[in-house]
Amino acid sequence: RVRSSAASDVYKRQANNRGFDTEIGCAFEMPLSEVACVSCGQCIVACPTGALTEKDNTQQVIDAINDPEKVVVVQTAPAVRAALGEEFGMPIGTNVEGKMVAALRRLGFDKVYDTDFGADMTIMEEANEFIDRVKNGGKLPIITSCSPGWVKFCETRYPELADNISTCRSPQQMFGAVIREYYRNPEINQGKKLVSVSIMPCTAKKEEILRPESMTNGRQDVDYVLTTTEVASMIRKSGIRFENIDGESTDMPFGIGSGGGVIFGVTGGVTEAVLRRLQTGHSRVEMDRIRTSGVRGDDGLKELTFDYMGKEIRAAVVNGLGNADKLVKRIQSGEVSYDFVEVMACRRGCIMGGGQPVGAGPRTRKARAKGLYDTDVNMQIKKSNENPMVLALYEGLLKGKTHQLLHRNLGVTEN
């Protein structure tokens, strides 16, 4: 059994047999296809032999970069910048966004974008969906759909929660759909075929891009997902001296993100960003009040209340599938009641995803989280609805296409 909070109660890996005959494998020696695997990648982190790795897509990406008939663009998730530096001997939690962008350009990517932009769109849509449910008596609690490991766990354990799950796509998928729509313009693609890549801290993202509800008109919006460790391997093999290169900025028109988008990478970040979106004020006092509301911290379950339109809203933030399982049972039994629930499959959220550097403990969790929170402090834009590029997108490219590109039909079914 995997002894990590993300994969707790999944029973994917255990030690089978005894003594010299001991083998690490699926529980009860079952085939991987028959166990409740949610693709979270925590088995990689917990594997005692260090033998497990993610499915490697680096060669496919390299081949695409080397194809003159293709334009290859990449988006990078917030949590990646807080962990990539560890692969090159830098202090844990160091924000290496600038160096990462420069390295990706040297690897040959034509454009480098920031998934913070996608997170801002997710916050906008999730907040709007929540407001609509509260005002019009929709299904509550609304449960976040950003974590693909959680979504798959929900499919297998709690298909009856289908109507509670938000219809919003994840930041990766929203941004992937927007990028593909943007590059349909011949003046933008210059007659070349688009290859869309994302760099994620999460192995489950590799499966997410293949899900029918994550596609637009039956076509993948994101072609390949690379994990933090995969892109670190590409940088090393290319001979780039990561620690010595100067930082560069992401490309426009998707190069501006908010602090709310950055903290998506930490458990509680989605809830905190939504709270910022719902509040009318944006002063330091208002931001501090939200920050100290109980949404942050390393606890497996955090509960908080806030006022919206004269109504007391009850929210819960849970990380780790074992904790999520317990919370769902309490909700279904009537023991507790919430209006908004954020779930992240991995402990402390994306910063501890299965695609991040291995060997992480409490000190690493704290340092990576601090790296993102410190970045948020220095961000000029704190709220997603104050991101001028996102607002311009809604008035332009997204006009009349919001539901098609940013939402999905999350058909929760039993496997």
Regions found by a protein language model. Give the residues of each.
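Residues immediately within or flanking Cys/His clusters that coordinate Zn2+
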Residues: 4, 34-40, 44, 140, ...
